[in-house]
Every structure is written in structure tokens, then in C-alpha cells.
From Swiss-Prot:
Keyword Membrane: no
Protein name: Cytoplasmic tRNA 2-thiolation protein 2
Pathway: tRNA modification; 5-methoxycarbonylmethyl-2-thiouridine-tRNA biosynthesis
Primary location recorded for the protein, binned into one broad class: cytoplasm
TM spans (from-to): none
Coiled coil regions in record: none
One matching Pfam family: CTU2
Annotated source species: Drosophila mojavensis
A GO term for molecular function: nucleotidyltransferase activity
């Protein structure tokens, strides 16, 4: 452990301790010369650890990070069929714009792939027509021709996929309101969305899926996954390539090296307008969810310590379970597609025993309490064998119905 400054916390309050960064960055609203190309610009962009630059130089820099993520790993074959998932967030619009730009370049610089766009409708309450995502989606389709846009509801199946021009907004009849906690609801929405996207990709014969995750969201995802009991799959949750989708579909995160500042600057430079209406924070009591609290925790640290997000999410590359040849016949979770660990640990036994005590409660009789508890623990461990520990926790928070 680092011990710098440990002995310096006296009356001066830690004079030699690490201090938060306070560098001034942001869009400079004045004319000036770009530090890269030397051209005069009406608006300069100042990123952390970079000199002020014009919009053209800034866009080249950010787009290079996108292309470098795909090129360095060589994970996207030539002329691949890709499914680009958008949710109306700023980062999803940035990804859409980058893919479209990469496909409109000359032959040498062109990204050789065929892209389709998917929007997953997860809003489960009536909304005003002017607040409907269809207006923004239709505008995007006109702007980013010739991409085909598809829409599907979160509670649907891949066969219910519709083209944007044929889609009509209707109230969702889902189980989102049946969860006892907002943490489980958000976790279910995330896993269900990924499961649905994999099915849609198979239907459209797409071999790869582009997900608009950036470094802050991946850092939050890493910490959240560990807290929710998904530690065995946390490396895939934050990696560039996630191969857990059905049908050998590969999920890619080409924006994983971008941060919030770069995304917001890109949105400003390209005059993009976010329209996300299915954010989990719109649901009641979502502010107290584990995901929301973790996101706020990471964001607050990032404000003062610029390397927080990078340090956290890059740790995920080093966290992976041991693999062996027996995994050829391994089974996978029916919802999140993660590898099932059939070895019962003492921790899981203790958790299920505690839940059994809570469920049986005062109905226990002293003479049969041990037998009843042991029987209940065995029943719980054998229930939902097709689900992993984290997804069984989601099922336990569901007041009625089943996840699959």
C-alpha cells in the first residue's frame, strides 16, 4: 500500500497529501489560433492534458480513438454486418455519427462494414407525443442515410422487431413495476436489453453489435457488477469485446476510451441533440439504487481526480476467473449469458440460509426448525438452476412473474 503522506496529517491537515486537480478546461468562447494546425478558429476546445484546438483537429483526435480501438484489437472483419444500438444518450449519438462519418470516407480510410441501427423502447408509461423518441429517431434517420433504423420494445421478442417507419408507440405491458427494489429493476433492464439485442442481431444476421459505453459508464459498471455478485464476468462487462451474446454474436465497445468531456465537446461540435427518455433515473425511487449511487460516487471522484475513471475501469481487464478445458461443456445463465458456477461456496450457503430463516420465520417449531431450514436451503439452491447468482437475486426481488 502507498504510504505517501501518512505521517504528515498533523495540525496542518495533510499538507503533503495528494491534492485534487484543478486545471481549467472547457470550450473557449473566443477566437484564437489552433495549437495543432495554426488556423484561426472562432471556437477552441480545451481538453484535459491537451492544448486548445479547433473543432476540426478535435474531431480528428476523437475519431482516431474510435478507429484505434477497433484497429488495434483487429476484432472487426472487413465487410462485417454490425448492429448499432442507440438509446438517445449523448454517447450513442456520438457513436452513430462516428460510424456514419467512417463510412463516408474515401476507400482508403473507409470503415468497411454494413451498419443497421436499433433503438430499444423501454418507456413503460404514457408520454406526450412531443416527448416521443420517434420524432428524434426520424430526424436521425434523415440525417444518417442510408442507415436502416429498427425499433423494438424491451418486453418483446426478436420477432416483434419493426422498421422505424412502421413502428407505433404503445404502453408497455412489462414486469418493470413488479420489482421490490430499483436496483433489481435497473439490473434486469440492462440484462434484458443485452439479451434482446443479441436476438435481434441474430435475426438481422449481424455478426457484431456496437454498444455506446464510455469510460465513466464502464468504471461504474465494474464497481456495480462486483457489488451485485457478477464478479466472475466483470472482465467481459468492461472489455472491448464481449462474446456472451447468443448465436456467436460479438458485442464491441469502440468508445471505451472516451470520457464525458470528449463526448460533450463532440456533441457541441456536431450540434447533436440527446433525447433519452428511457433512462432508469426516470423511474420512482431510482435515485437510491446501487447503480445510481455508484455512478454519483465515480463522477464526484472524477471531478477532482482526473485519473479515477481510467484507474477503475482498466482494472477490469485484470479481473477474470480461471478457465480450463472443462468449460467446453459449461452451462450459461439463461438471462445474462454468463458462465454458471455450479460449485456451491460457503458464502452462497450462508446467504441462502439467511433467506430461508427470513422466509420461514415464526412458523418454525423448535423440534423441526433445523430440518425445515436445511430443506429450504436445498430447495433454494436447486431453484432456477439456469440462472446465475446475480440473476437469481433479481428473481427474488420480483413480486410476481418470472424473468424468463
Amino acid at each position: 500500500m502507498c504510504s505517501i503522506g501518512e505521517d504528515d496529517f498533523g495540525d496542518e491537515g495533510g499538507t503533503h497529501a495528494m491534492l485534487p486537480s484543478c486545471s481549467e478546461t472547457g470550450i473557449v468562447l473566443r477566437a484564437g489560433d489552433c495549437s495543432k494546425c495554426g488556423q484561426s478558429s472562432q471556437q477552441l476546445y480545451k481538453l484535459n492534458f491537451r492544448s486548445a484546438e479547433c473543432s476540426e483537429c478535435f474531431l480528428k483526435y476523437v475519431r482516431h480513438k474510435f478507429r484505434a480501438a477497433l484497429g488495434a484489437a483487429k476484432v472487426l472483419p472487413r465487410n462485417a454486418e454490425i448492429l448499432l444500438v442507440i438509446d438517445g444518450s449523448s454517447e450513442s449519438l456520438v457513436l452513430l455519427d462516428m460510424v456514419h462519418f467512417a463510412q463516408t470516407q474515401n476507400t482508403f480510410k473507409r470503415l468497411h462494414c454494413n451498419a443497421r441501427v436499433l433503438y430499444v423502447d423501454a418507456h413503460c408509461s404514457p408520454i406526450k407525443e412531443e416527448e416521443s423518441p420517434l420524432l428524434a429517431l426520424n430526424e436521425l434517420q434523415r440525417r444518417y442515410e442510408p442507415f436502416e433504423f429498427y425499433v423494438i420494445q424491451l418486453n418483446g421478442d426478436p420477432q416483434s422487431l419493426q422498421l422505424l417507419k412502421d413502428y407505433t408507440v404503445r404502453q408497455l405491458d412489462s414486469i418493470l413495476d413488479q420489482f421490490n427494489s430499483s436496483t433489481s429493476r435497473q439490473d434486469y433492464m440492462q440484462q434484458k436489453r443485452k439479451f434482446l439485442v443479441g436476438g435481434v442481431a441474430m435475426k438481422l444476421k449481424c455478426s457484431h453489435v456496437f454498444e455506446p459505453s464510455i469510460s465513466p459508464s464502464l468504471a461504474t459498471q465494474l464497481l456495480t457488477s462486483v457489488a451485485l455478485g457478477r464478479g466472475a464476468s466483470v472482465a467481459l462487462d468492461v472489455a472491448l469485446l464481449d462474446d456472451r451474446l447468443m448465436g456467436d454474436v460479438k458485442l464491441l465497445r469502440p468508445l471505451k476510451d472516451l470520457n464525458d468531456q470528449e463526448v460533450q465537446f463532440y456533441v457541441h461540435a456536431k450540434e447533436l441533440k440527446a433525447f433519452r427518455v428511457d433512462d432508469p433515473s426516470h423511474y420512482p425511487l431510482s435515485g437510491g439504487s446501487l447503480q445510481s449511487l455508484t455512478r454519483d460516487f465515480v463522477a464526484n471522484l472524477q471531478l477532482n481526480y482526473a485519473s479515477t475513471v481510467s484507474t477503475v475501469f482498466r482494472t477490469g481487464d485484470k479481473i477474470a476467473p480461471k478457465r480450463n478445458s472443462k468449460e467446453i461443456m459449461a452451462s450459461y445463465c439463461a438471462l445474462c449469458q454468463s458462465l454458471l458456477d455450479n460449485n456451491i461456496s460457503d458464502t452462497l450457503l450462508a446467504i441462502e440460509y439467511s433467506r430461508a430463516v427470513s422466509e420461514v420465520g415464526v412458523e418454525l417449531k423448535m423440534k423441526s426448525s433445523c430440518d425445515v431450514l436445511e430443506q429450504r436451503v436445498l430447495e433454494r439452491l436447486n431453484e432456477k438452476e439456469e440462472l446465475c447468482h446475480a440473476c437469481r437475486n433479481i428473481q427474488a426481488e420480483l413480486s410476481s412473474g418470472t424473468l424468463i
